[in-house]
């Protein structure tokens, strides 16, 4: 428990804000968590469509995401039932000109060596290039002297066109949500270091069996409430300022409330607005953003894919937008026949939803050689236009600490090793809570 409990407000009920609130509560500080939306989770939350609770975007966690997994356990999530744990894999439909790469359950680095040896769809020169990349990256300590794009890094390491198309580019999009031609090579290496370059379990892929709100944010709110804190949804912050006694005054839903510390855990643009209102004089570095689109396709009950997840060969020129497909019926008992297709590409937003869904359904029918997949019963398109920041080389990201006692920032956009991921958000929330606690002690 803290020696002197401080009353702290956390503004924003996304994953970063929930992580900050749990960390503060764990350290004995009374917390008030404010979320302007009706549900917790921010850009990773459950949404209702056609009587089903799905996600506003399909997410994969890695076994390396220890801070996320530890906090989930702390708030009462059973990791064994909350996830389908798969070995690291990249598998394309058998009728596509793709690859089949699955890491066996062997100790590292044997699991990667055996996976590479057994991989189909890769030629000898592709496998040698992958082995060369892995060994050199390890020798370098997964560090670059100067950041560059992922595409430039792959060129320096003489990676083959086929390996880039089938493995590196899809991995880059999945991890950073930024095209390889624009993505930070150092951040990409950070993700590879903590997955491919770590223990076998760290490279495991964790597919959620719960909707994203239930996976952490809702349990986090229950956790802090059990410890006497409060969590308020639909709680719009109207103003934030500091009084002469160095306490923070927050106006929420026409009420003024007073706190010793504040963590701003909103997106960057709203954080900047609040910093301006508080008269901090701080200016956050500018960010650009990338979209993610999820296309849900409902088929007849019992319609299944051979595996829960596949990588797809995308080709915007041929109206093949899908990059990954998930059979949610293998993850959620009440979602038989529901497929989720993930698209990270700017061109598709120029299409109407009906045209986009039809194109994706045709892509699945062709990729799996199953004509019935061209005709779903219904579809739903969900686009997060500012899903992640563009993770470009040498990007300046703000620190959690602001230099103002009792005030910190939290969010996946803050300074850290990872791109805009759930682990990045949770790590930032933990760090922000620690910074506020330390600043109020001095």
Can you name each region flagged by the protein language model?
Residues 6-33:
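N-terminal Rossmann-like FAD-binding beta1-loop-alpha1 element of flavoenzymes
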Residues 68-69, 73-74, 78-185, 189:
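Mobile amphipathic helical/loop "lid" adjacent to a hydrophobic cofactor/ligand pocket
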Residues 238-354, 363-367, 398:
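Mid-domain catalytic core of redox enzymes
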Residues 45-63, 133-138:
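Glycine-rich active-site loop/strand segments that organize a redox cofactor
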Residues 324-442:
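Conserved flavin/dinucleotide-binding core of flavoenzymes
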Residues 16, 39, 269:
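Conserved Rossmann-like nucleotide-cofactor binding loop
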Residues 25-49:
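Glycine-rich FAD pyrophosphate-binding loop
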Residues 191-248, 252:
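Helical element adjacent to the flavin cofactor pocket in flavoenzyme catalytic cores
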């Amino acid at each position: 428990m803290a020696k002197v409990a401080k009353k702290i407000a956390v503004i924003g009920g996304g994953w970063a804000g929930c992580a900050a609130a749990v960390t503060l509560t764990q350290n004995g500080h009374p917390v008030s968590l404010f979320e302007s939306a009706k549900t917790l989770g921010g850009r990773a939350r459950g949404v209702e469509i056609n009587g089903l609770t799905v996600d506003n975007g399909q997410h994969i966690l890695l076994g390396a995401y220890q801070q996320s997994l530890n906090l989930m356990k702390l708030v009462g999530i059973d990791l064994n039932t909350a996830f389908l744990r798969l070995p690291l894999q990249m598998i394309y439909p058998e009728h596509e000109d793709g690859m089949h790469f699955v890491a066996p359950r062997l100790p590292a680095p044997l699991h990667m060596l055996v996976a590479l040896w057994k991989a189909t769809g890769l030629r000898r020169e592709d496998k040698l290039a992958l082995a060369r990349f892995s060994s050199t990256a390890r020798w370098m300590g997964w560090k670059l002297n100067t950041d560059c794009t992922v595409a430039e890094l792959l060129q320096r390491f003489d990676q083959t066109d086929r390996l880039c198309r089938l493995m590196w580019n899809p991995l880059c999009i999945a991890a950073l949500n930024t095209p390889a031609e624009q993505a930070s090579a150092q951040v990409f290496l950070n993700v590879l270091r903590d997955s491919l370059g770590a223990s076998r379990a760290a490279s495991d892929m964790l597919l959620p069996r719960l909707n994203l709100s239930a996976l952490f944010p809702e349990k986090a709110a229950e956790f802090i409430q059990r410890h006497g804190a409060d969590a308020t949804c639909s709680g719009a912050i109207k103003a934030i300022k500091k009084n002469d006694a160095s306490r923070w005054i927050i106006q929420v839903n026409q009420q003024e409330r007073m706190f010793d510390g504040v963590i701003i855990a909103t997106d960057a643009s709203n954080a900047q607005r609040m910093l301006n209102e508080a008269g901090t004089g701080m200016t956050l570095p500018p960010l650009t953003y990338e979209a993610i689109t999820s296309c849900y396709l409902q088929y007849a009950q019992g319609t299944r894919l051979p595996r829960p997840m596949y990588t797809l060969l995308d080709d915007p020129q041929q109206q093949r937008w899908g990059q990954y497909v998930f059979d949610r019926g293998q993850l959620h008992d009440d979602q038989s026949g529901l497929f989720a297709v993930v698209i990270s590409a700017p061109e598709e937003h120029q299409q109407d939803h009906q045209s986009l869904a039809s194109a994706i359904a045709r892509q699945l029918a062709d990729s799996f050689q199953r004509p019935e997949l061209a005709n779903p019963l219904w579809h739903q398109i969900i686009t997060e236009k500012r899903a992640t920041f563009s993770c470009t080389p040498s990007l300046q990201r703000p620190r959690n600490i602001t230099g103002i006692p009792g005030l910190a920032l939290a969010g996946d956009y803050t300074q850290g090793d990872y791109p805009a991921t759930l682990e990045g958000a949770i790590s930032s929330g933990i760090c922000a809570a620690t910074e506020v606690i330390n600043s109020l002690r001095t």
